[in-house]
Design a protein with these regions (language model features):
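Helical segment within the ABC ATPase nucleotide-binding domain
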Residues: 180-196
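Helix-to-loop junction immediately C-terminal to a conserved catalytic motif
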Residues: 53
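A short, proline-enriched helix->beta-strand linker immediately N-terminal to the Walker B motif
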Residues: 159-163
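Catalytic Walker B motif of ABC-type/P-loop ATPase nucleotide-binding domains
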Residues: 165-168
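Conserved ABC ATPase "signature" region
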Residues: 69, 117-135, 187
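Conserved ABC transporter NBD signature motif
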Residues: 61-69
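Conserved ABC ATPase signature
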Residues: 140-144, 148
Length: 248
């Protein structure tokens, strides 16, 4: 039985004027695994992420998510399709004036027809699932530690039961203890939701943190995929760019 593909990037090129940002990218991200897109700053990672989310259209080629060519969808269809994605950014991007529970409730109020009582119960379950205890439900982000804010952001990302969870630089700038906490959280979340189908994508330049938890790695340099392999193969790569990156 062939492996299910979550995302297929087929001959994707992106130009802004004469500037080539992505250059004939070809790779596939398997479903129900953790795949990290690594690269130096300016490699094109953020531009690639925007293509995966349908926020940018390629100059050439196509991006498909679970077999659906994003280039065939209009803006309303794309907006609906993005509900397949949950996101956690480098900074949790919480609403400062909303409590932890209200932050998690936001997408449920925006995109579902659940009753207030149902939303509240779902938010409680989500917060508990990421180890935020009840005494913190009504705290503002300013009253939470950095690690707890990450957890609230993850709970919000999971609110709409996404098929794909996308983490953008989740460990950048964190101390080793918090980095381990975030990595454990990513793995625990992937394992917890694996049965119903969850694909994890990490965008990062933190090679040490991400190799510990990934199944596959795509290494991007100046808009080109230099290496796409399992983590084990990536560590043993003879490519000088890969070795330079690993040994930074």
């Amino acid at each position: 039985m062939s492996e299910e593909i979550a995302i297929a990037v087929e001959d994707v090129t992106k130009k802004f004027g004469e500037l080539v940002i992505l250059n004939h990218l070809n790779f596939k991200i398997p479903a129900n695994k953790i795949t990290t897109i690594l690269g130096f700053s300016g490699a094109g990672k953020s531009t690639l992420m925007k293509h995966i989310l349908g926020l940018l259209k390629p100059t050439h080629g196509k991006v498909s998510v679970f077999g659906k060519d994003l280039g065939t969808l209009d803006e309303m269809e794309l907006r609906e399709f993005r509900r397949n994605f949950g996101m956690l950014f480098q900074y949790a991007a919480l609403f400062d004036s909303k409590t932890a529970l209200e932050n998690v409730a936001f997408p449920l109020r925006e995109f579902t027809k659940l009753k207030d009582s149902e939303i509240r119960e779902k938010c409680k379950d989500l917060l508990l699932s990421v180890n935020i205890q009840e005494e913190s439900f009504n705290k503002l982000p300013s009253e939470l530690s950095g690690g707890m804010r990450k957890r609230v952001g993850l709970a919000r990302g999971l609110a709409l039961s996404p098929k794909i969870m996308l983490y953008d630089e989740p460990t950048t700038g964190l101390d080793p203890i918090t980095t381990k906490m975030v990595n454990d959280l990513i793995v625990d979340t992937q394992n917890k939701y694996a049965e119903r189908g969850m694909t994890t994508i990490i965008i990062s330049h933190d090679v040490r943190a991400t190799l510990e938890i990934s199944d596959f790695v795509a290494f991007l340099d100046r808009g080109t995929i230099v290496e796409y392999s399992t983590v084990e193969e990536f560590r043993l790569s003879k490519n000088p760019l890969v070795q330079e990156f690993i040994n930074l």
